[in-house]
């Protein structure tokens, strides 16, 4: 197994387009690292540079203690699993998994043991004699993973491996990949645009935008302490609500003025706004849907953060409901208990959990209060 180090790594194409800009990251042995971001953010390009499928324009890439910028992909001791399974249709599952080992002229008895061991891990043993056309999408993806496992690489690279699966299979395969990481104890770098995969699988997540790292952190910290407006809006579904408000300082309390209301912030958040000289300035504040309440008990406990609005849309998702309404010109989503009596057209009171408010600079979009 191995650690990885990327120092000042850049990718510039001949037309001058910078796909990856000054990428710096230290990955520890056995970590499960997720690269996440919107399409075109540079996450797959970075993975391909690690794999050796894209040249590094500048910077240094180390796998273990070895600089591998100019090392051929086959000599980097990595294995890739792609979005497309790329299985040989005329070969059995066994032969698909064994093919790379045969090319490397590994002894036949070793190949047999490695393939059967990997098949056992992935629950493929009953399927070893089948052809890919007789397999489900999830089974085919497990075969693709098995083909990577038999190589016993130092690092697994996975490029959106679940994108071609339906929703139910994606959930099942997510669990399988998590179990696989626990069993193998190997380093995994995983690319996805799906934040659910990122939050559930990663030990750390690298959020990217326009080829630049926005934040590297644990899933919980990314969710609870986003460093800027982009990360706050990208992580979480439904996404964080964003509203503009004017800061008004009274003594040692900073208030957010919006829709005729003045929301007093807790001491720590107030201090950061006051120390930053935000009195009288317009800021953007964010609140997650689950921190917007319609229960009377919470409303009575938080009288200074109560708003009234008319429900526009009601979405029932079993145990919870999404309520959509406006606060001035800003759309707001609340995630509430399914036992709510609120329905479209109803005027409802809501309270915000002021402890969970995030305040961002209007110009730089950097967080002020975390």
PLM feature segments, named:
Residues 16-18:
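Short coil-to-beta microelement around the adenine-binding A-loop and adjacent beta1/P-loop entry
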């Amino acid at each position: 197994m191995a650690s990885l180090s990327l120092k000042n790594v850049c990718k510039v194409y001949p037309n001058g387009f910078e796909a990856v800009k000054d990428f710096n990251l230290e990955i520890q042995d056995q970590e499960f690292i997720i690269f996440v971001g919107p399409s075109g953010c540079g996450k797959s390009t970075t993975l391909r540079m690690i794999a050796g499928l894209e040249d590094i324009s500048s910077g240094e890439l180390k796998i273990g203690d070895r600089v591998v910028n100019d090392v051929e992909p086959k000599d980097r001791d990595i294995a890739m699993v792609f979005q497309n399974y790329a299985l040989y249709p005329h070969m059995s599952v066994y032969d698909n998994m064994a093919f790379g080992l045969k090319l490397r002229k590994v002894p036949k008895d070793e190949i047999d043991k490695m393939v059967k061991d990997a098949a056992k891990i992935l629950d493929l043993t009953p399927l070893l004699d089948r052809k890919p056309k007789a397999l489900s999408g999830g089974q085919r993806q497990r075969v693709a993973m098995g083909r990577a496992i038999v190589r016993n690489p130092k690092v697994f690279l996975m490029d959106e491996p679940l994108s071609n699966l339906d929703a139910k299979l994606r959930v099942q395969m997510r669990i399988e990949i998590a179990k696989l990481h626990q069993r193998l104890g190997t380093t995994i770098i995983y690319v996805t645009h799906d934040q659910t995969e990122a939050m559930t699988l990663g030990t750390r997540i690298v959020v990217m935008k326009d080829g630049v790292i926005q934040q590297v952190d644990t899933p919980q910290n990314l969710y609870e302490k986003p460093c800027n407006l982009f990360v706050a809006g990208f992580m979480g579904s439904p996404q964080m609500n964003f509203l503009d408000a004017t800061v008004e300082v009274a003594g040692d309390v900073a208030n957010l003025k919006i829709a005729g209301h003045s929301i007093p912030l807790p001491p720590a958040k107030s201090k950061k706004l006051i120390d930053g000289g935000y009195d009288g300035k317009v800021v953007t504040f964010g609140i997650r849907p689950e921190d917007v309440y319609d229960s009377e008990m919470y409303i009575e406990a938080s009288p200074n953060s109560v708003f009234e609005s008319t429900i526009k849309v009601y979405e029932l998702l079993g145990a919870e409901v999404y309520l959509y309404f406006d606060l001035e010109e800003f759309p707001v989503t609340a995630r509430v208990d399914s036992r709510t009596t609120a329905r479209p057209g109803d005027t409802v009171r809501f309270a915000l959990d002021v402890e969970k408010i995030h305040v961002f600079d209007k110009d730089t979009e950097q967080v002020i209060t975390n």
